[in-house]
C-alpha cells in the first residue's frame, strides 16, 4: 500500500517509532495467515509480542487517520451518505473491558460479548463504504455514564456528535436501521443539521396531514386527516415499480409520525412477488421534500457498512483481539478497520473511471501475501529487485490464487 506512509507523515504529533509501527502493522495484517493476535503478528514482522502489546496501548487519533483516508479516496462532489450501525463480537473471560449482553444478529438474540459501533461514509454511486469512527459500546450502567435517564441510544448519539465535524461538508443524509428510529436519536441527528433515513415499524403510528380548506369557525385549525393504514394504500401517491425489481411497488406520502413528533417522507415498498401474500416495509426520512425513489437508493447504500463488518471479521481480525484493556481493545478494533479503508482507497484509485466498481478483499489479501513472499525471496536469495519486478511473469506470480470479485 503506497498511501500509508504519506498519510502517517501528514499527522501532527506522531513520532517516528509509532509511525513505523503503524505502517508495518497495516501491511502485516493483510499478509498474515491465521488469527490476528500478538503471537501471530510477531511471526510475520520484526516486533515481539511484548512490543506489540505495548504499542496497542499507545494513544492514536484514529478518527483523524480515517478522515485523511476518506479525503484521499472520495470525491467531495459525489453523492455521499453517512451510516451508523453496531456489530456483535463474541468474547469470553471476566476481566475484559466492556463485557455485557448485546444483540447478536446471527443468533437473533442477546448474547454475552462485546459490541463495536461504527460510523461510516458511503459513496452512493460506487457502493463503497469507509469507516470514519469506531468505538466499543460500554455495557449497562457504563453506557449511561452513571446517569439513569440516559440509555444506550444516547451513547450512540454521542458517538455521532463527536466526529460530526469530520463528515464531508456536502453530506446531508444519515442512514440507520430501525433500531435507531427513536426520538432521542432522531432529535440529536437533527441538531447536527442532518436528515435521517431509517426503517420504520410495520405498525408505525402515523397520521396523514390535512391539506384541505379550513372552515370558518372558532378553535384551532385542523391538522390531521386520519391514521395511516398500511393495509390500505389508496391515500398514498403511487410511484410505480422499480426498474430493476418490477415486483416492488412504491407508495409515498408526507405524514406526521406521532412518537417522533415530526413530519416524515414515508415510502412503502410493497412486494407483490407472491400475490397471495404481499409483504411491505416502511421507510421514512426527516426530509419531506426527498423523492421517494431517491430515498430507496440512499437507504440501500446503508448496507455497505455491513461489508465493513464482514470483511474485517473475515480478513483483518476484528474478532481476534487478545487484549483486555479498554485502550488496547479500541486500538485493535480500529486497526482492523483501517486496512480496509486503505485497501479500498487504493483500489478506487486503480479503477478510476471504471463502472461498476468491483472490489474483492480476498483478492487483495492474496496479492499482498504473494508480494510479501516474493520480496522475501529477493531478499534472502540476493536477487535483483528491479530485474524481478520488471519480469513478464512478476504480475502473474503476484496475482497467483487471487479470487475475482
Give the label of every model feature segment.
Residues 57-133, 138, 250-256:
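Active-site-proximal, Lys/Arg-enriched surface segment
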Residues 1-9, 15-18, 27, 32, ...:
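Single, function-defining residue in the core of a domain
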Residues 53-58, 327:
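Short linear loop/turn motifs
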Residues 16, 43-55:
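Short, basic interhelical loop/turn and adjoining N-cap
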Residues 39:
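Residues within the helices of the helix-turn-helix
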Residues 51-54, 64-76, 153-161, 171:
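Hydrophobic, well-ordered secondary-structure segments
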Amino acid at each position: 500500500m503506497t498511501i500509508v506512509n504519506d498519510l502517517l507523515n501528514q499527522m501532527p504529533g506522531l513520532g517516528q517509532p509509532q509511525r513505523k509501527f503503524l505502517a508495518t502493522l497495516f501491511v502485516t495484517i493483510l499478509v498474515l495467515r491465521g488469527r490476528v493476535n500478538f503471537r501471530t503478528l510477531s511471526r510475520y514482522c520484526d516486533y515481539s509480542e511484548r512490543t506489540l502489546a505495548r504499542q496497542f496501548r499507545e494513544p492514536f487519533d484514529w478518527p483523524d487517520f480515517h478522515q485523511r483516508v476518506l479525503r484521499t479516496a472520495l470525491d467531495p462532489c459525489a453523492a455521499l451518505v453517512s451510516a451508523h450501525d453496531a456489530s456483535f463480537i463474541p468474547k469470553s473471560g471476566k476481566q475484559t473491558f466492556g463485557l455485557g449482553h448485546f444483540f447478536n444478529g446471527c443468533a437473533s438474540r442477546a448474547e454475552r460479548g462485546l459490541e463495536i459501533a461504527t460510523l461510516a461514509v458511503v459513496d452512493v454511486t460506487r457502493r463503497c463504504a469507509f469507516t470514519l469512527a469506531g468505538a466499543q459500546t460500554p455495557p449497562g450502567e457504563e453506557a449511561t455514564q452513571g446517569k439513569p435517564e440516559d440509555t444506550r441510544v444516547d451513547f450512540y448519539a454521542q458517538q455521532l456528535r463527536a466526529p460530526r465535524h469530520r463528515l464531508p461538508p456536502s453530506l446531508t443524509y444519515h442512514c440507520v436501521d430501525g433500531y435507531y428510529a427513536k426520538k432521542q436519536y432522531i432529535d440529536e441527528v437533527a441538531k447536527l443539521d442532518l436528515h435521517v433515513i431509517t426503517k420504520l415499524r410495520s405498525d408505525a403510528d402515523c397520521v396523514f396531514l390535512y391539506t384541505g380548506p379550513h372552515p370558518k369557525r372558532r378553535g384551532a385549525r385542523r391538522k390531521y386527516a386520519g391514521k395511516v393504514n398500511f393495509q390500505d394504500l389508496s391515500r398514498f401517491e403511487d410511484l410505480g415499480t422499480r426498474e430493476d425489481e418490477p415486483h416492488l411497488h412504491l407508495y409515498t406520502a408526507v405524514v406526521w409520525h406521532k412518537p417522533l413528533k415530526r413530519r416524515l417522507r414515508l415510502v412503502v415498498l410493497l412486494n407483490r412477488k407472491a400475490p397471495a401474500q404481499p409483504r411491505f416495509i416502511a421507510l421514512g426520512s426527516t426530509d419531506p421534500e426527498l423523492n421517494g425513489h431517491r430515498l430507496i437508493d440512499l437507504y440501500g447504500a446503508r448496507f455497505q457498512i455491513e461489508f465493513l463488518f464482514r470483511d474485517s471479521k473475515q480478513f483483518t481480525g476484528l474478532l481476534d483481539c487478545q487484549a483486555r484493556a479498554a485502550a488496547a481493545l479500541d486500538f485493535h478494533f480500529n486497526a482492523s478497520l483501517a486496512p480496509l479503508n486503505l485497501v479500498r482507497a487504493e483500489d478506487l484509485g486503480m479503477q478510476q473511471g471504471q463502472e461498476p466498481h468491483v472490489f474483492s478483499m480476498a483478492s487483495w489479501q492474496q496479492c499482498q501475501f504473494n508480494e510479501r513472499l516474493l520480496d522475501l525471496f529477493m531478499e534472502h536469495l540476493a536477487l535483483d529487485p528491479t530485474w524481478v519486478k520488471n519480469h513478464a511473469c512478476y504480475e502473474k506470480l503476484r496475482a497467483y490464487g487471487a479470487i475475482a470479485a
